[in-house]
Regions:
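A contiguous pocket-lining binding segment that forms or flanks enzyme active sites
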Residues: 150, 157-204, 208
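Low-complexity, intrinsically disordered Ser/Thr/Pro- and acidic-rich segments
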Residues: 2-8
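A hydrophobic, small-residue-rich beta->alpha segment in the mid-to-C-terminal subdomain
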Residues: 200-243
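Charge-patterned, long linear interaction tracts outside catalytic cores
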Residues: 240-276
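Intrinsically disordered, low-complexity regions enriched in acidic/Ser/Thr/Pro/Gln residues
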Residues: 9, 17-98, 102-111, 116, ...
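General beta-strand structural signal in soluble alpha/beta enzymes
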Residues: 60-62, 86, 118-120, 148-152, ...
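Extracellular/luminal Protease-associated
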Residues: 108-151
């Protein structure tokens, strides 16, 4: 059955839909803090999030399937999730495609940024066509999007890179097939993780972290603290091995692990990766 977007809805209904969607995009962090989060890789941000989350860090927020970062040289990306579903194999969606594209672009453009477009490909596990290429990368960059995460494919890789648009995807492909946005502003599942519109996303070559609502504040401070904690305990001990016997080195690392856990526990109530 053809799933309709907003194409047949009156303007008042579309406006109400947009207002409801924007609720999840209420700015929970200043842009300056997002820029600081972007300076750290995603594992570092995960380490901080792990200390403040109320969720199970073994299953919540992270990808559980392999992602490929096709622009690792661009470093991490940070933004608010714009969620979309596509089904490139289904030609039924081409009916009214121009109007559907227009409404979708208007929806995305009116959301606060920076934005990361997260796309669930309903053709999975097959890969029939790509939503992304040179044209869509440039258009989305112009309306405040910094990149995408899709469990489908991307193409025009060099041209997307030239546009400054980062992509984590399942694979590359040649064509676009019958791709149009099918649904948007909806809950989706990509790479084994559920993502809602407006979630804070941090992503790089390691994968992604979709921060649960309400856990954005304190994320940067926790991440910086845990990174410093590593440097001042375990990494310091490991790098200070010259002239030590093997037993002395191992003893020092053991003590550093205890110090690491104690510092984390005193700050967060949890001892972190290397503590008890």
């Amino acid at each position: 059955m053809l799933k309709l977007g907003l194409g047949s809805c009156p303007a008042s209904v579309i406006e109400l839909y947009l207002m409801m969607s924007k609720k999840n995009f209420t700015q929970r962090l200043p842009h300056s803090e997002l820029l600081q989060l972007k300076r750290w890789n995603t594992p570092t941000i995960y380490n901080g999030w792990e200390q403040i989350t109320k969720s199970d860090p073994t299953c919540a927020a992270i990808n559980h399937e392999v992602t490929t970062d096709f622009m690792p040289q661009m470093g991490p990306m940070v933004g608010w999730a714009v969620t979309v579903k596509i089904e490139p194999s289904n030609s039924d969606y081409k009916k009214g495609a121009a109007n559907r594209w227009s409404e979708y672009r208007s929806y995305v453009a009116n959301l606060p940024g920076p934005k990361i477009v997260v796309i669930q490909d309903l053709d999975k596990p097959a890969t029939i066509g790509s939503f992304w290429g040179e044209v869509n990368a440039n258009i989305h960059r112009s309306i405040g999007c910094v990149g995408t995460i899709t469990d489908g494919a991307v193409r025009d890789l060099d041209e997307m890179t030239n546009a400054g648009f980062k992509a984590l995807a399942k694979r590359l492909c040649v064509g676009h097939a019958h791709v149009v946005p099918v649904e948007w502003g909806c809950n989706i599942n990509v790479f084994g993780q559920s993502i809602a519109p407006g979630q804070l996303i941090h992503a790089d070559k390691h994968g992604f972290l979709a921060v649960p609502f309400g856990e954005e504040k304190g994320l940067l401070d926790a991440s910086v603290f845990m990174d410093k904690n590593e440097c001042e305990t375990l990494i310091k001990s490991a790098r200070n091995s010259e002239g030590q016997s093997l037993n002395d080195l191992l003893s020092a690392v053991d003590q550093a692990g205890k110090d690491f856990g104690l510092a984390a526990r005193e700050r967060f109530g949890s001892s972190g990766e290397f503590g008890d």
